[in-house]
Amino acid sequence: MKTVLLIGLGRFGRHLAMQLNELGHQVMAVDRDEERVNECMPFVTNAQIGDSTRVDFLRSLGVSNYDVCYVTISGNFQNSLETTSLLKELGAKYVVSRAERDVQAKFLLRNGADAVAYPEKQLAKWAAIRYTSNHIFSYIELDEQHAIIEVAVPEDWQGRSIGELDIRRKCGVNILGVKRNGKTDVNVSPETVLDADMTLLVLGENQELKKHFRL
């Protein structure tokens, strides 16, 4: 369990708060809008109405005591940038800020953000891959170069073992696990035989995934 400070309760911030709560983390939620704060009260540990661009308000939250600080302010990049910078000045351990464009990400990283989230960009990429393919069932982007996909077993792999196929050496990807009938098995070995009713959980560089699985 981690302690989380979440600033900005728009649609993304609200959904993030709900997910963090489901994962069992303690969440302090902050927004200027009283209605948004009240809506989030049922699924956060605590919530406050306040202006995150005011250093005295942020200082009163004890930002250095949180494991992670999220800045998910929408519609006002200047406020997001100022909040990010102030959090770091006040000793925040780890700051994740929301960006909509690459240029915003650059400014945020230069002004205190340890990481940047692109919710719209990441969702768009996932949706483009997932819903234009009959054989890709899930896509998780780890960074600009790497991803994990859930993919149907290629026809020429069916009935053969991972060791026989020599997948890691020939394809440059790693089989993390297999799924069958909705159940995931991560205890795969070179002896694991791949069948048509399975899907594979595959980690690799994007260029290798595109080459071997037609992303």
Please provide the spans of the model-predicted regions.
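Cytosolic regulatory regions of ion transport systems
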Residues: 1-215
